[in-house]
């Protein structure tokens, strides 16, 4: 049929992960998807064997799914992810490309059948949806010869950075989420909306060539995401706190909604999580604000212990607090078998907050 589509016409509607509230339908144009495909030309998808293990409806998956379909790559699709199965498929099919979220990398490296030699075929590894820890990046670079790319951004577009891990490691920037993608711009805003300078933390806003058309039937939510510079150009608000260093590398601090206001002081939950995750008996953790009549909010940690650990909650809490300032001190710990996650692997902190009853 004779069908003509304009580049600015709607192409798809993807839903946000809903980690902080009700998922929102995000509208993307044909131009946005064309730019996604053209931006991966250097990754040789025409000869690729691509492992697909995340939900097909997510923007995370589309990053490798669409280029591989467009260029005729081989797809190795998992109906449901499990770490040992993914490791086995990489070895069996000689996987060359994979988009994995941080928790998948963690579980695959911890699995009993993880062997670095089985990853020799892998040329490109990608990560997004949540920050990939510096320690995990180091393990990937040590155990594979692959190019590791970490993407930070929004399904909505606007804010987008890329970390080329081997280059970042050489420059001592591995803890960052990279530099702004070609054609993009980033700004850091203070609490009053003022522009901040290098190494000053504030809300990250950005603009790119790939920007959604807003939220489906959510006009107010769309407007709330907008920020305009002095020239009237549209930027998107990320809802994340971070800073740009003097070389333009972006470092994340926390989600604005995840910051804890205790006794008038802002506490970054990620700082506390890093302290907990560095403990030998902790697999992973999530820290949220617990209501407190005395302080307003206090930090409370949900922790997954390593097998065989017999320490009680207070021992873990005190051990972590030894590395934190008194202002950051964790008030309590709850052990869990696993943390609640979305289908794409993001920790659902709103579910953790639902555990609380207001106490002094």
Regions from the PLM with identified roles:
Residues 1-7, 111-112, 360:
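ANL superfamily adenylate-forming
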Residues 7, 12, 26-47, 53, ...:
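Conserved structural elements of the adenylate-forming
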Residues 13-25:
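Conserved adenylation A10 loop of the ANL superfamily
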Residues 34-49, 57-97, 111:
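Conserved AMP-binding/adenylation subdomain of ANL enzymes
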Residues 70, 95-100, 109-172, 185, ...:
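Gly/Ser/Thr-rich phosphate-binding loop
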Residues 90, 98-101, 208, 213-214, ...:
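AMP-binding/adenylate-forming catalytic core of the ANL superfamily
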Residues 129, 153, 178, 240, ...:
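Active-site glycine-centered loops adjacent to acidic/histidine catalytic or metal-binding residues
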Residues 179-183, 192-227, 265-267:
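Conserved ATP/PPi-binding loop(s) of AMP-dependent carboxylate-activating enzymes
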């Amino acid at each position: 049929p004779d069908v003509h589509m304009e580049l600015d016409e709607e192409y798809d509607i993807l839903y946000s992960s809903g980690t902080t509230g009700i998922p929102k339908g995000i509208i993307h144009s044909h131009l946005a998807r064309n730019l996604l495909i053209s931006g991966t030309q250097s990754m040789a998808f025409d000869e690729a064997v691509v492992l697909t293990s995340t939900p097909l409806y997510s923007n995370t998956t589309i990053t490798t799914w669409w280029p591989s379909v467009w260029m005729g790559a081989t797809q190795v699709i998992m109906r449901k992810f499990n770490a040992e199965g993914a490791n086995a498929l990489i070895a069996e099919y000689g996987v060359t490309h994979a988009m994995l979220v941080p928790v998948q990398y963690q579980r695959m490296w911890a699995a009993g059948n993880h062997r670095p030699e089985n990853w020799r075929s892998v040329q490109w590894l990608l990560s997004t949806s949540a920050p990939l820890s510096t320690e995990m990046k180091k393990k990937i670079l040590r155990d594979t010869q692959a190019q590791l790319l970490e993407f930070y951004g929004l399904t909505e577009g606007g804010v987008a950075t890329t970390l080329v891990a081997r280059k970042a490691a050489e420059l001592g920037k591995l803890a960052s989420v990279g530099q702004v993608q070609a054609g993009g711009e980033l700004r850091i805003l203070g609490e009053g909306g003022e522009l901040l300078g290098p190494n000053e933390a504030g809300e990250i806003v950005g603009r790119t060539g790939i920007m959604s058309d807003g939220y489906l039937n959510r006009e107010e939510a769309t407007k709330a995401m907008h920020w305009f510079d002095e020239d009237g150009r549209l930027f998107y608000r990320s809802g994340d706190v971070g800073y740009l260093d003097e070389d333009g590398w972006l470092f994340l601090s926390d989600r604005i909604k995840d910051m804890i206001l205790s006794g008038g002081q802002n506490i970054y939950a990620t700082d506390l999580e890093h302290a907990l995750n560095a403990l030998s008996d902790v697999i992973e953790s999530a820290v949220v604000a617990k209501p407190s009549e005395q302080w307003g909010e206090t930090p409370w940690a949900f922790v997954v212990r390593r097998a065989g650990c017999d320490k009680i909650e207070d021992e873990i809490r005190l051990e972590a607090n030894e590395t934190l300032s008194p202002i950051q001190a964790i008030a309590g710990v709850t052990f869990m078998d696993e943390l609640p996650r979305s289908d794409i692997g993001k920790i659902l902190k709103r579910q953790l907050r639902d555990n609380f009853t207001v106490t002094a």
